[in-house]
Amino acid sequence: MVSPENANWICDLIDADYGSFTIQGPGFSWPVQQPIGVSSNSSAGVDGSAGNSEASKEPGSKKRGRCESSSATSSKACREKQRRDRLNDKFMELGAILEPGNPPKTDKAAILVDAVRMVTQLRGEAQKLKDSNSSLQDKIKELKTEKNELRDEKQRLKTEKEKLEQQLKAMNAPQPSFFPAPPMMPTAFASAQGQAPGNKMVPIISYPGVAMWQFMPPASVDTSQDHVLRPPVA
């Protein structure tokens, strides 16, 4: 049997020469070996290149950050300048509108004061025109009402005129110059006529008390000279 004092008994059984390969007691460690085909110089070169690349990236990133910040600042300033230019143009245009004949003012506060004054004046004139328009509308309504009343009055007067014309035509119509033939007289009236030969009134039943000679001239009706002009026959 192998005595426990000899700790290298395994090496005696292996027919290979490993050089410095030794077996140590408790607490031994294996030596760190390099990968096959890779030298220590190449690994050092890789580490060095990685460090150089990182070092080269840091200044570039700082430059890009500064460029981006400067470009953002310049674009903001450009936008602000454009906004101010547009605002100045608006003020110049407003000043030219407020005072067409005079050169435009450069004081923005004065331009705003003039604009407020002009707006207040125009608002007052607009209110006056609105009130005048409402009063004119009321007058138009009143005139329309009077027009309708006058139209009704005109129609009424026209109707009365037509009635008066019809009445006037009826009054101016020619009257008949003769009377209809009287009916037969009774015998009592005939005997009365014989007893009163000088009576010129002939009783008519339809028209009692009407003289028959009413349409003859007075000279023809006069009988005072009959005994001279027409003597009775002997």
Swiss-Prot record:
**Effect of loss of the gene:** Plants are more sensitive to IAA conjugates.
Residue ranges annotated for the bHLH domain, each copy included: 71-122
Main subcellular localisation: nucleus
Q: In which tissues is it expressed?
A: Widely expressed throughout development, mostly in vasculatures.
Q: By what name is this protein known?
A: Transcription factor ILR3
Question: Where would you find the membrane-spanning parts of this chain?
Answer: none
**Highest taxon in the source lineage:** Eukaryota
| UniProt GO BP | glucosinolate metabolic process; intracellular iron ion homeostasis; regulation of DNA-templated transcription
Q: Name one GO cellular component term.
A: nucleus
Please give the function described in this protein's UniProt entry.
Transcription factor. Plays a role in resistance to amide-linked indole-3-acetic acid (IAA) conjugates such as IAA-Leu and IAA-Phe. May regulate gene expression in response to metal homeostasis changes.
| Cross-referenced InterPro entries | bHLH_dom, HLH_DNA-bd_sf, ILR3-like
The answer, when asked if Iron is one of the entry's keywords, is: no
Q: What PANTHER family would the database entry show?
A: BHLH TRANSCRIPTION FACTOR, TRANSCRIPTION FACTOR ILR3
Keywords, ordered alphabetically: DNA-binding, Nucleus, Transcription, Transcription regulation
Q: How does it assemble?
A: Homodimer. Interacts with BTS and BHLH47/PYE.
What species does this protein belong to?
Arabidopsis thaliana (Mouse-ear cress)
Record-level Gene Ontology MF annotations = DNA-binding transcription factor activity; protein dimerization activity; transcription cis-regulatory region binding
Task: Give its localization.
Answer: Nucleus
Cite the CDD domains for this sequence.
Answer: bHLH_AtILR3_like
Q: Where is this region: Disordered?
A: 34-85
Q: Identify the stretch annotated as signal peptide in this record.
A: none
The protein's matches in PROSITE patterns, at most eight in alphabetical order, are given as: BHLH
